[in-house]
Amino acid sequence: MTITIPACAEGTLRAVLLSPTHGFLAESYYEDARRDFTSLSYVTKVNGWGSFSGAVALATSPLAEHMDPNNILVIYRTPPGGAAEYIDFAGIVRRTERFVTSTDIELVQIYGREADSIINRYFIEPTAGSVNNSKTGLADDVVKGYVRDECLLDPTKVYPNFFVASDLGESATTLSRDIRYEHLAGVIKNIRDAADDFDFKITILDDLSAFQFATYEHYGLDRRIGSASPLIFSLDNRNMQMPRYWRRGYDGITRILILGGGQGLDRTVVTVENAAAEALWGFHEQTYDDREEDTPNLTSVGEGVLLERGPTSGLDFEIISANYGVEWKVGYKVSAEYAGVEADYEIEQVRVVVNSEQLESPIEAITPDLRLLELRD
């Protein structure tokens, strides 16, 4: 789903560079993406992390001399129509290049990742005197506990100006985990996917003084059908094009054997089936190897695999109304209607690409990725 609009035609973008300790270095306003960036792209995600790249002219941009590895790039957006400015993206520069183009313009190019990638740099170690790092509680609080253990307790591993939000119990799912030398980011994603009732995100504070890891019942606004202010994509609302409703029937999986831990006769096997689908479309069985998963969670794993691989249906479409930053942002939950079908989605990711090089009118392409939450057909 891609929306192409004139870059910042009615609003503005603002870029700010900070030092690794969040000290101010430089900023740049631009109304048409041509004053500083010859190119700029960034991806912002919820429950993960995006990336960014950008290039500026060395001779004219106030940002050029500060484009160093480990500095922080913050992108502000003021949407059209007088809406308030907000932080659309914050990331950490990981690589820089300085070069001369074929047209003899000297540029500085930066590449980096969204701030959420901080959690991708840690492993969960056993607690002192224990075989594992074991936690039990609400899923979102367990996640924050692991982040505190790895990112805050050891002064040699602490990231400057980083903290974890308080435990507020955004999740309603209680679970236990025994972790030993596992990737922190992977554990966080696994817990989040198992619970599927909270979001996580690392954001930069409004005063730019620090990054914060937090969990949310909904990171963005809930604008699904039935909410106080629903956002519905439909042909009647003229904000949808090329809708496609599809159904997959007989070739879907109706029964899944989840192979858990153990060997031989001692191996745990859990069967999950869709009896209604078997009656309609016939029996279709497969196995799924997940020996690393705890036995109590094998059923939920099977339900997830069955949902993904089983008889199913979907509604795909393209958004044609811009309104990014006004009607919707990353993390928002929205709905769609077509052919008597209703569907709910989470906007998992937004990709923004501003290309001004050799263009009289710079173009901003905005591409949201939607995750289907529920289909009612």
What are the residue ranges of the model-derived segments?
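Short, low-complexity Ser/Thr-rich regulatory SLiMs
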Residues: T44, E97-V100, I202-D206, V354
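A mature extracytoplasmic/lumenal domain signature
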Residues: L58, E114-D116, I204, G262, ...
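Short structured motifs
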Residues: F37-L40, K157-V158, G331
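Acidic, small/polar-enriched beta strand-loop surface segments
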Residues: T2-R14, H22, K189, D193, ...
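Short intrinsically disordered coil segments
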Residues: D68-N71, E125-N132, L231-N237, E273-A275, ...
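Oligomerization/assembly interface segments of phage tail-like spikes and tubes
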Residues: S41-S61, I105-I118, I191, I258, ...
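Charged- and aromatic-enriched interaction segments used to assemble
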Residues: E106-L107, Y111-R248
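Beta-strand-rich assembly/attachment modules of structural machines
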Residues: M1-A139
